[in-house]
Amino acid sequence: KHFETNNKKYLYLSGWMIAALRSEFGPLPDQSMHEKTSVVSLIAELYQFLRQADARELGGLFRELDAAKESDKESIQDRIDNFETHVVPIIADIDAGFGNEEATYLLAKQMIEAGACCIQIENQVSDEKQCGHQDGKVTVPHADFLAKINAVRYAFLELGVDDGVIVARTDSLGAGLTKQIAVTNEKGDLGDQYNSFLDVEEVDQDSANHGDVLMKQGDKLVRPKRLPSNLFQFRPGTGEARCILDCITSLQNGADLIWIETEKPHIAQIGGMMKEIRKVIPNAKLTYNNSPSFNWTLNFRQ
């Protein structure tokens, strides 16, 4: 026990670390290309190791107790009663769920069974997943992401874990693209809010081209900008507003903590978004990426 106590300590299994060190394909970039069971295997390995450490130390104490004189038994029993377990909370990164909500549920269930008590999930498209600090990220509409948050919650509840923790990460700040246009049934609903951030141009039916995707926004007919890859583009400068909406909806639909991924440490930017989030959810709690890929000294000096 390097810190002499495990109080407020935990293990965090990040996706980029698993991809780099635990994939059978060899070191991979942080793009969810590693086997989805790699994280499960590492959770089980670590959890078993920590339990074995407990068994070793407690076994030694009980042997001491059996062999001790009557006058020494009280102090040994006190050490047993106040024994601090090696087992600490394990936080597991499930990336974007490695598939749809059903796949997310099945993988989350395996992670929890292996020993995870907290699961982090992000709103990127699973098969377009990028490292949080890279460009070219693609997000999914809120309905898709909330379905995956619910899938993780169902996995916890099915296994009898009522206090399992879900961290909802938004990559919207650095994501300029979406895989699809959100389904919307009425003006102002969540799908409509998501689509309102799209980069569009007003058109009329006569100027529409064959194969164009057209939307009605208010009284206007608009054409969202679509790339040759069939991805749709958000308007520049909408990242912060999208992050705020992501966080509010995630917390309102099953997430316990929020994670706003940024390209560099920017305390004022994070603080501004949190103020807006807490106008709606006063007790919102943020986790932040203390990433080794950030040059913390340089950024704080700047």
Place the predicted regions along the sequence by residue.
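Alpha/beta enzyme core
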Residues: 1-302
